A protein has these predicted regions:
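Auxiliary Fe-S-binding modules of radical SAM enzymes
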Residues: 163-309
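Phosphate/pyrophosphate-binding loops at sites that engage ATP/ADP/AMP, CoA/4′-phosphopantetheine
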Residues: 43-51, 176
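Glycine-rich beta-strand-to-loop/alpha-helix junction loops that act as flexible
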Residues: 57-63, 90
Length: 309
């Protein structure tokens, strides 16, 4: 479930597959009526067979904890079903006791931790000025101490930034302090906000799996259709899919296998003409993404030293 409008976030990560955040915001409020979001969850539950849904996840086209009624929505959703509820978060607001209390209702929380130092945090995540590294680590540590659910920390590895032995050791030291249940290593395999962002090479991956602890594993992008192929209009189904993240054309067709590849291809072409979809070329692959997403086109500013913090 997406509780905030597109790119409503207090970070502007260089690797974000939804493009740049402009402007960055740190305002907590009810961006959408909570009852509307809960009603959409109920509708989705009613339209699927038992066993179709493994998790209900508040993931957001930005930062879910910016919705000030997140805790209430989690509790209301849990009252509807026995399906576990998860929340992905950049954990920048966990220093606030009320945010920790809201997330404590979830069965699993997936915070991001991409850096072991303030300097690298600011270089990769480009946070709102009030979202300091010290607050992030303090909040995450305090949340872990009180949280009874599953804590799975996500680390996005970027070539030349946080894939060195030194950078990974700094992250590992914080992971040892926080003691998550698992560490999920992710790679920027979809179009990132900045074109110079690349996944690490073999050496960086070897360092990561060796240094980040026994609970660390590399996870790939989700490939399920999330039930969106049940929608009646192929164009709206395509928009719903690519609004979550950019997808290669073949992925869109697999996700929407209710329609023929020709029907999906024609829908993509119409959406591009109408300005509702855009083509993003990255890593030699042609991706389709949301027309609202804004991707960088230039090279990274800064010295070689800054690229290997």
């Amino acid at each position: 479930m997406d509780p905030v409008p597109f790119k409503t976030c207090n970070w502007n990560c260089v690797y974000c597959q939804l493009g740049r955040t402009t402007p960055v915001t740190n305002e907590r409020r009810d961006y959408y009526p909570p009852e509307r979001i809960v009603a959409e969850v109920k509708e989705a539950l009613d339209s699927h067979r038992p066993g179709d849904i493994d998790w209900i996840t508040f993931v957001g086209s930005g930062e879910p904890t910016l919705h000030s009624s997140l805790g209430s929505m989690i509790r209301q959703v849990k009252a509807l079903t026995d399906i576990p509820v998860a929340v992905t978060t950049n954990c920048s607001l966990l220093h606030q006791p009320e945010v920790r209390a809201e997330l404590s209702a979830a069965d699993a929380v997936l915070p991001s931790l991409d850096a072991g130092t303030d300097r690298l945090y600011r270089a990769i995540n480009r946070p709102h000025p009030s979202c300091t590294f010290d607050r992030l680590i303090t909040g995450l540590t305090e949340f872990r101490q009180a949280y009874c659910g599953r804590l799975w920390i996500e680390v996005m590895l970027i070539k030349g930034m946080n894939d060195s032995e030194a950078a990974l050791a700094q992250i590992a030291a914080l992971l040892a302090q926080i003691a998550p249940d698992a560490v999920h290593i992710s790679l920027p395999v979809r179009p990132p906000a900045e074109p110079w962002v690349e996944p690490p090479g073999t050496e960086g991956l070897a360092y990561a799996t060796a240094i980040l602890g026994d609970t660390a594993r590399i996870v790939g992008p989700a490939s399920k259709s999330f039930g969106l192929s049940r929608r009646g209009d192929v164009g709206e189904a395509v928009v719903a899919v690519i609004s979550r993240h950019p997808m290669a054309e073949e992925e869109v067709m697999r996700a929407l296998d209710r329609w023929t590849p020709d029907e999906v291809g024609k829908a993509l072409a119409r959406l591009a003409v109408d300005g509702r979809a855009q083509v993003v070329n990255r890593y030699g692959v042609r991706f389709w993404g949301c027309s609202k997403a804004r991707y960088g086109t230039g090279q990274r500013a800064g010295s070689a030293e800054e690229k290997t913090l």
